[in-house]
A protein has these predicted regions:
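Acidic/histidine-rich catalytic neighborhood
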Residues: 314-364
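Acidic, His- and aromatic-enriched active-site or binding-groove loops in soluble protein domains
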Residues: 199-226, 283-292, 338-354
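Beta-strand elements within well-structured catalytic alpha/beta cores of enzymes
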Residues: 78-92, 107, 132, 174, ...
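A long, amphipathic alpha-helix that forms part
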Residues: 212-216, 223-226, 271-315, 378, ...
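N-terminal Sec-pathway targeting helices
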Residues: 1-15
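His/Asp/Glu-rich, glycine-adjacent segments
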Residues: 14, 24-39, 136-231, 249-278
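Active-site neighborhoods of enzymes that stabilize oxyanions during catalysis
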Residues: 350-480
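Active-site nucleophile/metal-coordination loop of metallo-enzymes that catalyze phosphate/sulfate
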Residues: 34-56, 64-80, 92-179, 190-199
Length: 501
């Protein structure tokens, strides 16, 4: 009995103890607070998580840096040359002295230059462009002035028809040898016909276009010819001849059919020089503006080089001019100066500083004819504003005697005078009373150093020339460009070149 009671008591105590434990576990630590003494260096949970995140990012970056980067393709310029030949009309040799021209300055540093380009006689726009393009003198290419007589009573002002050019221009020379060529606004490059017209040329010249517009138009056509975006307004041109020539010439295969000769003429500097004079602020501002337009053009060309040019092509930039510019003091109306009586027996084709006089309606008797011409020459000699040269008196170095287009007498004005069609009260008058031009050109460079012009030649990444050039002439430009393109000059062209690689 005692043992049974003891067993019951033990069981009761065990039950009570178990119930107490259950009650404690059920109510948990409610009401019980634990505190921890902070130690130096303790961090919050947020800080620890942020450090872990940053460590994970750093490990990822290190892994990326360890990866080998893709090799960058670099143009070494050891492929074919692509020549961009830009002629800037009226770019006088001293214009850079008072103009901000970072682009021209860079060309001077990276390549070669001279402000002593001595143009061939006559120092006029169309003859000079013809001389540069053909590598021959006016007696051979036939462009003896900006206004020429092609026959009795047939006068062409600012000739544009390429058929008037009597020697092969470089756009034909290059195309014939497989070089795809674009030529815009270069005198006598319009309306090309024959077997080897340039791949791209214009049918007409727009005198109102700015340099920026001309550059953009050429760039659009260049892009289109390279398989890029079509030009906004595609110019009329001949566009298939280069492909036919390309298949037959090694020079073409080097270019893969892409353009390798681009030729342009820019006019803004000449225009401002004529209107305001060569030393006017407006003229220097035009030099700066053209410099900026060229910088933008060539920055774009280089940015798109892999599309525009053949693989590893070397960009050659050739900047030339046709002539400089002199201050104009007086205009001369030659018909007014000679008078109606003398003009009955003369056709005169005059432009700027040069006039070609052709006799007409002379006496049939040789003796009478000789007497008449002698009297005529005597009257001409009384006019002090120009010198009169017979055909046999033309300086040989001018190479000016063309059998049909050079006059029986050549009149060359003094520096500072220009022939004009406008008529004033007197035959000699101020520019403000005539065309309102204050710049003149056409004078022999040996008489007016202001006819001298600027030349730059540089290449990227490899320049074909470095350092300062001395005096250079225009006759060598054709052969120089041919040499850089790896082709032969035209038959009859001067073969001397600038000292290019």
């Amino acid at each position: 009995m005692f043992r049974s009671l003891a067993s019951s008591i033990i069981t009761l105590v065990a039950i009570l103890l178990f119930a107490s434990i259950l009650l404690f576990l059920w109510s948990g630590s409610e009401g019980i607070k634990f505190t921890r003494v902070a130690f130096e260096g303790d961090k919050s949970t947020e800080s620890v998580l942020e450090e872990a995140r940053r460590a994970n990012m750093a490990s990822t970056e290190v892994k990326d840096d360890d990866e080998t980067p893709e090799p960058v393709s670099q143009n070494l310029g050891d492929g074919p040359a692509v020549v961009v030949w830009i002629n800037i009309s009226g770019f006088r040799g001293d214009y850079l002295e008072k103009s901000e021209t970072p682009f021209f300055d860079k060309l001077k540093t990276d390549g070669g230059e001279t402000n002593k380009m001595r143009p061939s006689f006559p120092c006029l726009t169309f003859p000079a462009h013809a001389t540069m393009a053909t590598g021959v003198t006016p007696d051979k290419h036939g462009i003896v002035s900006d206004r020429i007589r092609t026959g009795v009573g047939q006068i062409v002002d600012k000739p544009a028809d390429g058929a008037l050019l009597l020697a092969e221009p470089i756009w034909t020379t290059a195309t014939r040898q497989g070089i795809a060529t674009l030529v815009h606004d270069w005198p006598l490059s319009q309306k090309q016909t024959g077997d080897n017209p340039a791949a791209h040329f214009l049918d007409s010249y727009d005198p109102e276009s700015t340099d920026e517009v001309r550059l953009n138009k050429a760039l659009e056509q260049w892009r289109a010819s390279s398989g890029g975006a079509a030009p906004a307004a595609a110019p009329a041109d001949g566009a298939a001849s280069a492909d036919a020539a390309a298949s037959a010439d090694p020079a073409a295969s080097a270019g893969g059919g892409k353009l390798r000769l681009i030729m342009l003429r820019l006019e803004d500097i000449a225009r401002q020089g004529l209107i305001h004079g060569p030393r006017a602020d407006e003229t220097f501002a035009a030099v700066t503006a053209t410099d900026k337009a060229l910088q933008t053009f060539f920055d774009t060309v280089q940015a798109e080089w892999t599309t525009l040019a053949p693989p590893n092509a070397n960009l050659v930039i050739f900047i030339t001019t046709d002539h400089g510019l002199a201050e104009l003091d007086k205009n001369v109306n030659i018909a007014h100066l000679l008078g109606d009586e003398m003009m009955k027996n003369a056709d005169i084709v005059a432009h700027d500083a040069v006039a070609n006089l052709f006799f007409k309606d002379l006496p049939e008797n040789d003796g009478e004819k000789k007497i008449f011409i002698s009297k005529f020459d005597n009257e001409l000699s009384k006019r002090i504003y120009f010198r009169t040269l017979k055909k046999e008196e033309l300086p040989p170095e001018w190479s000016y005697l063309h059998p049909e287009r050079t006059g029986d007498r050549v009149l060359v004005l003094k520096t500072g005078y220009a022939f004009a069609d406008q008529k004033a009260e007197e035959p000699i008058f101020d520019p403000g009373d005539g065309p309102n031009f204050f710049g003149g050109f056409g004078y022999p460079v040996e008489e007016s150093v202001r006819m001298s012009g600027q030349v730059f030649l540089a290449g990227y990444p490899n320049s074909p020339l470095s350092g300062t050039l001395d005096e250079v002439g225009q006759l060598s430009f054709h052969a120089t460009v041919c040499k850089m393109l790896g082709i032969q000059p035209a038959a009859g062209a001067v073969t001397d070149t600038l000292p290019v690689n």
